[in-house]
């Protein structure tokens, strides 16, 4: 646990040590102290702040990834600057991001403690050597579990208007920021409209979209309510909001809305995929990529049953082979592809 705030360190340590399968073996106020302690006992996961004295978190992260690749979870503030620096950290090899405890400690323990524990567990399973190679080349009250049905409106039963416009729906989680960068930067300007759910806290997705927009030939933006899904543009679900695909005549739009977490996530891949099955049917391509858990597995199956082409990322190129594995297990994927083949599959949708 590396953070220059003693208060933050103590809060995070208490949360993680309360989990039966997690032990915090050391804390440090800066990366230089962390290096000394890690030489004595190397951790399975590092939780890292990005703005610290003596050595910043990004420099430390790059050092770790080049010398001894280890899963790193970034713990960042909900500020514009914090979001930008966090994107740099994810690009440098961090596997996930969580938000720092703010003044409302009780609110953090209620809303974010479980997310922190789940993120650290997920990071421990990450194939970080593959990620490094790519970079260099318990709740306070009973949990209520929801399915995408609580977000999706009731089906009207009316036949969909005919359209030939193709869309692509992508869902991903741990390791997904790097995977999305690899896929989207490989796309030409002429490609189908894309809608994306990447599990990420609110405030960070706008910076993520802006970074991709500067790297890609296609346009990339954080989705806003009623944005049209257009060829040559990717819309990324805002953190903390669900993203649905809608049809109006022969055009597709997105709806951004509140609602309870689905499969413990908001945004949820299942919500996007199931809405795509209903709105686009056989005109859609569904892609599920690296991530822990089963979010998106049910939705990908529904897309396939609606006539869509569906793809799961293979185990060899996944940082965490959880979500794709579950989708394959349930029969939702009609193809299993390496990450490097995803862009070609998207372009094929135009044909």
Curated annotation (Swiss-Prot):
One of its GO terms (cellular component) is cytoplasm. Its main location: cytoplasm. Its EC number is 3.1.1.61, 3.5.1.44. Residues 161-351 form the CheB-type methylesterase domain. Phosphorylated by CheA. Phosphorylation of the N-terminal regulatory domain activates the methylesterase activity. It catalyses: [protein]-L-glutamate 5-O-methyl ester + H2O = L-glutamyl-[protein] + methanol + H(+); L-glutaminyl-[protein] + H2O = L-glutamyl-[protein] + NH4(+). CDD domains: CheB_Rec, REC_CheB-like. One of its GO terms (biological process) is chemotaxis. The active site is at 173, 199, 295. InterPro entries: CheB-like, CheB_C, CheY-like_superfamily, Sig_transdc_resp-reg_Me-estase, Sig_transdc_resp-reg_receiver. Residues 1-115 form the Response regulatory domain. It is an enzyme of class 3 (hydrolase). The keyword Phosphoprotein applies. It comes from the Bacteria. It holds the Pfam family Response_reg. Keywords: Chemotaxis, Cytoplasm, Hydrolase, Phosphoprotein. Signal peptide: none annotated. It is found in: Cytoplasm. GO terms for molecular function: phosphorelay response regulator activity; protein-glutamate methylesterase activity; protein-glutamine glutaminase activity. The modification 4-aspartylphosphate is found at residue 49. PROSITE patterns: CHEB, RESPONSE_REGULATORY. Belongs to the CheB family. Involved in chemotaxis. Part of a chemotaxis signal transduction system that modulates chemotaxis in response to various stimuli. Catalyzes the demethylation of specific methylglutamate residues introduced into the chemoreceptors (methyl-accepting chemotaxis proteins or MCP) by CheR. Also mediates the irreversible deamidation of specific glutamine residues to glutamic acid. Contains a C-terminal catalytic domain, and an N-terminal region which modulates catalytic activity. This is Protein-glutamate methylesterase/protein-glutamine glutaminase 1. The gene is cheB1.
